[in-house]
């Protein structure tokens, strides 16, 4: 059993469950769709990690094919994409070559690396979701006005997620802290940081 793998995943579960609960409470108080969607994204991501940890604890090995976790993680990223789509309401988006190039690069890397396991279909869905999220985020940064910090952080989250899968290809010893865990911790904290930025936008709206 990989002790540091468990520590890393337990940390992610605790952070995301707390963030999901907080976002849900604020969503009800503020009647905010953005915060509700963010809460659902956190919950889905945490569910995927919980399945992974339970498999690791009960069976004692890493799940080689774990579609339950993959579907949960994909659902989380679809919720993140929904947040970015909501930001386009009332905004005139122009075709952006930098945004298109960034989106195409992220989508290509995610698909070619088979980020979501051996399934080409699931990997393609994630690649399209990641690419669309990056495209909208970069477009908002270029043309979107007041709230660019959340868009920048969303791009960082996508990059860290794809980077995590790339790094995992070269990680064989999960018993000690190394680059894989640094990227995963950065991803967890970056996702959690979306909450205060989103809450600030909701308060100022």
Predicted regions and their residues:
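Short, aromatic-rich membrane-interface segments at the entry and exit
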Residues: 12, 34-36, 63, 92-96, ...
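Hydrophobic transmembrane alpha-helical segments in integral membrane proteins
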Residues: 1-18, 110-125
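Membrane-interfacial loop-to-transmembrane alpha-helix junctions, especially the N-terminal start
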Residues: 29-44, 89-99, 144-157, 205
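Internal transmembrane alpha-helix with an interfacial aromatic "cap," most often the third helix
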Residues: 19-30, 52-99, 134-138, 195-202
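Membrane-interface helix caps and helix-loop-helix hairpins in membrane proteins
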Residues: 56-64, 110-121, 170-175
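Generic alpha-helical transmembrane segments
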Residues: 72-77, 120-135, 188
């Amino acid at each position: 059993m990989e002790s540091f793998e468990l520590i890393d995943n337990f940390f992610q579960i605790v952070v995301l469950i707390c963030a999901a609960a907080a976002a849900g409470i604020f969503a009800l108080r503020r009647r905010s769709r953005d915060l509700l969607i963010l809460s659902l994204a956190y919950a889905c991501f945490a569910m995927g990690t919980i399945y992974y940890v339970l498999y690791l604890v009960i069976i004692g090995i890493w799940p080689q094919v774990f579609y339950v976790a993959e579907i949960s993680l994909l659902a989380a990223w679809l919720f993140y994409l929904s947040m970015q789509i909501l930001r386009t309401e009332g905004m005139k988006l122009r075709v952006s070559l930098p945004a298109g190039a960034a989106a195409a690069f992220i989508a290509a890397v995610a698909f070619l690396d088979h980020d979501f396991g051996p399934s080409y279909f699931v990997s393609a869905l994630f690649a399209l979701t990641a690419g669309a999220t990056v495209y909208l985020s970069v477009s908002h940064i270029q043309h979107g006005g007041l709230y660019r910090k959340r868009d920048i952080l969303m791009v960082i989250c996508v990059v860290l997620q794809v980077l995590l899968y790339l790094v995992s290809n070269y990680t064989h010893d999960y018993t000690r802290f190394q680059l894989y865990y640094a990227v995963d911790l950065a991803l967890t904290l970056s996702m959690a940081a979306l909450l205060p930025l989103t809450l600030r936008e909701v308060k100022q709206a």
